[in-house]
Amino acid sequence: MTKKNASIPLRYLSSIVFVVFLPWWIPLSFNKSLESWVTNWWNTSQSETFLNDIQEKAILEKFIELEELFLLDEMIKEFPERRLEKLRIGLQKETIQLIKMHDEDHIHTIFHFSTNTICFVILSGYSILCNEELFILNSWVQEFLYNLSDTIKAFSILFVTDLCIGFHSPRGWELLIGYVYNDFGLAHNDNDIILSVLVSTFPVVLDTFFKYWLFSYLNRVSPSLVVIYHSMTE
C-alpha cells in the first residue's frame, strides 16, 4: 500500500514531464525516419516547384541580377565566347542551386507541420485517456495558488500582465509569433501583414479579457487581492 501511494506522485510527475517535453521529443524521435520519408516523397511525386510570394520574389531578384551581368558582358564584348560560356554555366548552376534550396524549404515545412500534427494528436489522446490524472494535476495547481498570499498573487498578476500586455509586450509577441512561424516551417518577413495584425491586436484583446476577469471574478472571490493589485499599479 505504501509503495502504491509513493508511486502515485511519481506517475503524476512523469505526466507533467511528458506533457511539457513532448513538443521536443516528437521531432527528435521522428527526425530521421519522417524526414527521409518526406524527402523521398517530395523528390519522387512532385513534378513542379511550388513557391510562395517571398520565395518567388527572392528567385526573381537573383535571376534579374544574373541577367544584368549577362547583358552587361554581352554589351562590352570583352572575350565574348569565353565569358558568355562561363555566364551560361554559372546561370545554370545557380538555377539548380536555387531549386534545391527551395525544395529543402518545402521539405522543412512539411516535416515541421507533420511533427506538430503528431504532437497535437498525441496530446489530444492523452487528454481524453488520462482525464483523471489531469484533473488531479489541476487540483494540485489550484491548491498551490490558493495557499499563496494575496500580495504574492497580486505581484504575479502584475508581472504576467506587464509581460503579456505591457508597453514592451509587442516585441515579445513578435518574437513568439515568429517562433511559431519558424516551427511550422513558414517563411515570413518584417512586413508580414498577418504578423503586424496579430502583434497590434492580440495584446489589446488579452487586456480586455483580463480587465473583465479582474472586475467580474476577482472582485467577487477576493476583494482584498483587487485592492492590493490596484495599490501596486498606482
Curated annotation (Swiss-Prot):
Highest rank taxon of the organism: Eukaryota
Catalytic activity: K(+)(in) + H(+)(out) = K(+)(out) + H(+)(in)
GO BP term, example: potassium ion transport
InterPro entries membership: CemA (IPR004282)
Localization annotation: Plastid, Chloroplast inner membrane
Transmembrane domains' residue ranges: 8-28, 117-137, 157-177, 193-213
Predominant location: plastid
Signal peptide coordinates: none
Keywords noted in UniProt: Antiport, Chloroplast, Hydrogen ion transport, Ion transport, Membrane, Plastid, Plastid inner membrane, Potassium, Potassium transport, Transmembrane, Transmembrane helix, Transport
Membrane topology reported for the UniProt record: Multi-pass membrane protein
GO molecular function (one): antiporter activity
Pfam family, one: CemA
Cellular component, GO annotation: chloroplast inner membrane
Family (UniProt): Belongs to the CemA family.
General function of this protein: Contributes to K(+)/H(+) antiport activity by supporting proton efflux to control proton extrusion and homeostasis in chloroplasts in a light-dependent manner to modulate photosynthesis. Prevents excessive induction of non-photochemical quenching (NPQ) under continuous-light conditions. Indirectly promotes efficient inorganic carbon uptake into chloroplasts.
Name of the protein in its database record: Potassium/proton antiporter CemA
Protein's organism: Citrus sinensis
